[in-house]
């Protein structure tokens, strides 16, 4: 007659797999070690289950692991915290919302303007004093001469401050104009050339009209012809002496 053999190795195998912290899973091992061997043992198991019903078979420190998750949690308890895959938690009202690093709700135009000024590398502060009351107004302008209103500036809102009027400023006083002295007046009639068309001859003579330039060109050509005739005249050539004997 064959009898059923019990399996006492179940407890030992489980103990080897989990052999890190036996005290944590002690109730679990108690159930495994007391496997039923006779019909009378079935009456003992309910008592054990009732005795351990108030205890949880997993520790909260193991991240809520159940079943085989206890083995993995015990093996990694010294390194990191394991959480169950299917674990769901309700929304906890005690948790705080994420911190908002940038909040534009409470910012004002003055703060934006100050931030814009700090970002500018080159800027100019212009302070205007109004009368004997002592009140003053300060404006900020960038390196291009535009007034800084706020951090968000459109091109149509900009207002240029440093503008040079080339019409009202006399070009005769500028150093560039002083270096070009021949452009001040006509070379022939000495008429002022400011604001008029200028006709250049040979890059160094300026004239007020084509007539003056043509007259000067004609005079230069006449002088050139005279010099050429004078250089080829026999009277201006050197004396020629022939070798010979003077007989008296």
From Swiss-Prot:
Keyword 4Fe-4S: no
Induction remark: Down-regulated in response to mild as well as prolonged energy depletion. Up-regulated by glucose, sucrose and mannose.
Superkingdom, natural source: Eukaryota
MF-aspect GO terms: zinc ion binding
Region entry Disordered, spans: 85-108
Keyword flag Nucleus: yes
Cellular component GO terms, alphabetical: cytoplasm; nucleus
Positions with biased composition (Polar residues): 85-94
Record-linked Pfam families: zf-FLZ (PF04570)
Zinc finger (FLZ-type): 181-224
Sorted UniProt keywords: Cytoplasm, Metal-binding, Nucleus, Zinc, Zinc-finger
InterPro entries recorded: FLZ12/13/14, Zf-FLZ_dom
Subcellular locations according to the entry: Cytoplasm; Nucleus
Main subcellular location: cytoplasm
Gene Ontology biological-process entries: response to glucose; response to mannose; response to starvation; response to sucrose
Functional description taken from the UniProt entry: May act as an adapter to facilitate the interaction of SnRK1 complex with effector proteins, conferring tissue- and stimulus-type specific differences in the SnRK1 regulation pathway.
Oligomer status and interactors: Interacts with KIN10 and KIN11 via its FLZ-type zinc finger domain. Interacts with KINB1, KINB2 and KINB3 via its N-terminal part.
Family to which this protein belongs: Belongs to the FLZ family.
Classification via PANTHER family: FCS-LIKE ZINC FINGER 14, OS02G0174800 PROTEIN
Protein name per its UniProtKB record: FCS-Like Zinc finger 14
Record organism: Arabidopsis thaliana
